[in-house]
Amino acid sequence: MLVLASNLIDFPILSIHVGGEITRTARAIVDPEDLSIIAFELVGGIVSDPEIGNFLMVEDIREYGDDGFIVDSADVFVEAQDVIRLNKILKLNFNLRGLKVVTKTKKKIGKVVDYTVDSNTFSVYQLVVQRPLMQSFVDPQLTINRSQITEIDDYSVTIDHDKEEIKLTDSSKDEEFVPNFVNPFRKPNYAGQEEESSVSDNSSKTSE
């Protein structure tokens, strides 16, 4: 399932231990080597405590759904210096959004304004590209598959050729996360099925 990365910003983080939201995402940290999200920087809530780490590694996400990312507790949050790979990428100050997109012949295609992420692997799947002004009247936005990317640097993304450009469809914008783990806010009943726990019921009532 694909989801727009922009939909993962200001996304709730829910704790099993607390039974509700404890903080939110501030930005995604993308590794330019393999174009995957490795962590989310967090802001607000419990991470305002200086003793609580302010980054969530994607491997510590138990589940993700419409309500937010579910984690065991704030104990999984880390500081940048605690994880060598994370610290290294943060020092690169890499930001996929805003990069120019050009072909091998240096023809300008546009700039990255968003990207879609595979909800199972957190790998960047497609770039959402805003076209230059004169071309935007025909194709305001395009999506480019990661397989067409040949090079990335601090300023631009180079793609194989512009023959591979595809118009962004409305269905791409509307795709949402769906859980791919058993919801820890549910518990099995005696029939071996799942039923909502009181925590889940309370969360649903609050959202209403």
PLM regions with names:
Residues M1-E208:
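Peripheral interaction segments used for macromolecular assembly
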